[in-house]
Amino acid sequence: MQTDSLSPSPNPVSPVPLNNPTSAPRYGTVIPNRIFVGGIDFKTNESDLRKFFSQYGSVKEVKIVNDRAGVSKGYGFVTFETQEDAQKILQEAEKLNYKDKKLNIGPAIRKQQVGIPRSSIMPAAGTMYLTTSTGYPYTYHNGVAYFHTPEVTSVPPPWPSRSVCSSPVMVAQPIYQQPAYHYQATAQYLPGQWQWSVPQPPASSAPFLYLQPSEVIYQPVEIAQDGGCVPPPLSLMETSVPEPYSDHGVQATYHQVYAPSAISMPAPVMQPEPIKTVWSIHY
């Protein structure tokens, strides 16, 4: 009886006769009386395959592999009553066409789990990488089809992000430095109206901000239980303003109210007071 050479993996191994199931390949076991059938159309059912292969021998079982959704993966297995019927199909595999479509027929091999690095396996000559009609890839080498289960890699969840709060800083000096703008408000009197002019320097500069000696209150930052930062309420501090002077005109007095923040220094809020007319009598 003519024997075929089997190769259960891309690595070359010694030929194994099909009529001797005890001489199994190195990395798999030949299932007796069973053949592998690939290239099956997804419309083909098990009854159609049984009817087709029954003309070549006594068919015991037909199994088409489906996915979880019940859709055919494009390959299956046919088990015959005797090994001779299975051997006959393998010898005529190149001549078998089902509905004008060539079938990939080979021995059924149960693969064994071996610890071989995938990178060390080099594909041999004559190896074909095929895809079923439903998109499942497999390797066809020396009449044997190999289906590789895709490796599932678990992605670790990202570390939860936490906000880092800085410790409260107590400043007792009346002069402090902070990346902020230097605001200077001046009042100019024009006939018939008031005009406020607030010049601003370029944003790249970070000059000192000089305040009059006054009480500066800082509140520490509270840390929430979830690791976030709870900003404290803004504390307002009022600077002293020079005494109003008398002139042959009208001068408006105002207070500059500052709202310090942990990020930037906002613009001063101008609160003009009611206009006071100062009369001076010269003798």
Swiss-Prot record:
Residues 1-25 are annotated as: Disordered. GO terms for molecular function: mRNA 3'-UTR binding; translation activator activity. Residues 33-110 form the RRM domain. Keywords: Cytoplasm, Developmental protein, Differentiation, RNA-binding, Spermatogenesis, Translation regulation. It is found in: Cytoplasm. Signal peptide: none annotated. GO terms for cellular component: cytoplasm. Residues 160-184 form the DAZ domain. SUPFAM superfamilies: RNA-binding domain, RBD. GO terms for biological process: 3'-UTR-mediated mRNA stabilization; cell differentiation; positive regulation of translational initiation; spermatogenesis. The keyword tRNA-binding does not apply. Its main location: cytoplasm. It comes from the Eukaryota. Pfam families: RRM_1 (PF00076). Belongs to the RRM DAZ family. Interacts with DAZ1 and DAZL. Probable RNA-binding protein, which may be required during spermatogenesis. May act by binding to the 3'-UTR of mRNAs and regulating their translation. This is Protein boule-like. The gene is BOLL.
